[in-house]
Structures are given as C-alpha cells and as structure tokens.
C-alpha cells in the first residue's frame, strides 16, 4: 500500500471493508423484524456507486462550464460604458425653482387650517 496514490487508497478502502466482513449486517435490537438484511458488499457497492456518480456529475458540470463563453473582456466593458454615456437620459433635467407651478396651492391653504 506504500506505492498507491491517495486516490487509489480511497477507492480501495470500501472494497477492503466489504471483504473483511462478509456476514450480513443485522440489527441487534430487533432480531425478529421482517426486514431484509443487507450485506457489507451491497453497502460498499452503494457507497462506491454514489461516489462514482458524484464524480461523474462534477466532471460533467466542469466540462459543460468550460463550453460556456467567458465573461466580457475589458475592451467590451469599455465599449459598453461608452455606449451608456452616449445614450440620452430618459429623465428630465432639474430646473431652477419655479413658483408658478404651485402658486394655485397657496390659495387653497386657508381651507385646511
């Protein structure tokens, strides 16, 4: 085992655990239940299958993520910023104080006192 890589050791561990205990796993508290017993080999197979499936999903996400184009570069960001400054603002510019707009409101004020 000294020459194996750490990844190989991880994959070998469930296999060794399955081989070491070949008798079925039984519940000690409930010996008369109608449950089916699961052997250590089946448990190791489930764990190994789960690990393999997880690695496959991670690899698929990684490779599919590499197919998507990267974010915009600095040149495109500069053009976008320039395009934003060139567009006209949809908001009206602020003007000085205009008293004629609200002058009719002052005539109604005495009614609200």
From Swiss-Prot:
Reported modifications of this chain: Following ligand binding by associated receptors, tyrosine phosphorylated in the ITAM domain which leads to activation of additional tyrosine kinases and subsequent cell activation.
Outcome of substituting residue 84 to V: Found in patients with early-onset Alzheimer disease; uncertain significance
Cytoplasmic face residues: 62-113
GO biological process: one example: stimulatory killer cell immunoglobulin-like receptor signaling pathway
Function: Adapter protein which non-covalently associates with activating receptors found on the surface of a variety of immune cells to mediate signaling and cell activation following ligand binding by the receptors. TYROBP is tyrosine-phosphorylated in the ITAM domain following ligand binding by the associated receptors which leads to activation of additional tyrosine kinases and subsequent cell activation. Also has an inhibitory role in some cells. Non-covalently associates with activating receptors of the CD300 family to mediate cell activation.
Signal peptide extent: 1-21
Tissue-wise expression: Expressed at low levels in the early development of the hematopoietic system and in the promonocytic stage and at high levels in mature monocytes. Expressed in hematological cells and tissues such as peripheral blood leukocytes and spleen. Also found in bone marrow, lymph nodes, placenta, lung and liver. Expressed at lower levels in different parts of the brain especially in the basal ganglia and corpus callosum.
Modified residues (Phosphotyrosine): 91, 102
Effect of residue 80 to W: Found in patients with early-onset Alzheimer disease; uncertain significance
Stretches assigned to the ITAM domain: 80-108
UniProt name for this protein: TYRO protein tyrosine kinase-binding protein
Location relative to the cell: Cell membrane
Superkingdom of the organism of origin: Eukaryota
Annotated site (Important for interaction with transmembrane receptors): 54
Effect on the protein of changing residue 49 to L: Does not significantly alter the formation of homotrimers or homotetramers
Impact when changing residue 50 to N: Reduces formation of homotrimers and homotetramers
Bias (Polar residues): 87-113
Outcome reported for the amino acid change (mutating residue 47 to A): Found in patients with early-onset Alzheimer disease; uncertain significance
Subunit (UniProt): Homodimer; disulfide-linked. Homotrimer; disulfide-linked. Homotetramer; disulfide-linked. Homotrimers and homotetramers form when low levels of partner receptors are available and are competitive with assembly with interacting receptors. They may represent alternative oligomerization states or may be intermediates in the receptor assembly process. Binding of a metal cation aids in homooligomerization through coordination of the metal ion by the subunits of the oligomer. Interacts with TREM1. Interacts with TREM2. Interacts with SIRPB1. Interacts with CLECSF5. Interacts with SIGLEC14.
InterPro entries: Tyrobp
Origin organism lineage: Eukaryota, Metazoa, Chordata, Craniata, Vertebrata
Residues noted as binding Ca(2+) in the record, renumbered to the chain: 50
Recorded GO CC terms: cell surface; membrane; plasma membrane; secretory granule membrane
Keyword check for Protein biosynthesis: no
Membrane topology: Single-pass type I membrane protein
Cross-referenced PANTHER family: TYRO PROTEIN TYROSINE KINASE-BINDING PROTEIN
Known disease link: Polycystic lipomembranous osteodysplasia with sclerosing leukoencephalopathy 1: A recessively inherited disease characterized by presenile dementia along with large-scale destruction of cancellous bones. Initial symptoms, starting in the twenties, are pain and swelling resulting from cysts in the wrists and ankles. Extremity bone fractures could occur with minor trauma. At around 30 years of age, patients gradually develop neuropsychiatric symptoms, including epileptic seizures, agnosia, apraxia, speech disorder, memory disturbance, euphoria, and loss of social inhibitions.
């Amino acid at each position: 085992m000294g020459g194996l890589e750490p990844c190989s050791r991880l994959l070998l561990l469930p296999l060794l655990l399955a081989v070491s205990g070949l008798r079925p796993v039984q519940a000690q508290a409930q010996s008369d239940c109608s449950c089916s017993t699961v052997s250590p080999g089946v448990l190791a197979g489930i764990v190994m299958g789960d690990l393999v499936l997880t690695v496959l999903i991670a690899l698929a996400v990684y490779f599919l993520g590499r197919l998507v184009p990267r974010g915009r570069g600095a040149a495109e960001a500069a053009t976008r910023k320039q395009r934003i400054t060139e567009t006209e603002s949809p908001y009206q510019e602020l003007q000085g104080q205009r008293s004629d707009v609200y002058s009719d409101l002052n005539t109604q004020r005495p009614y609200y006192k």
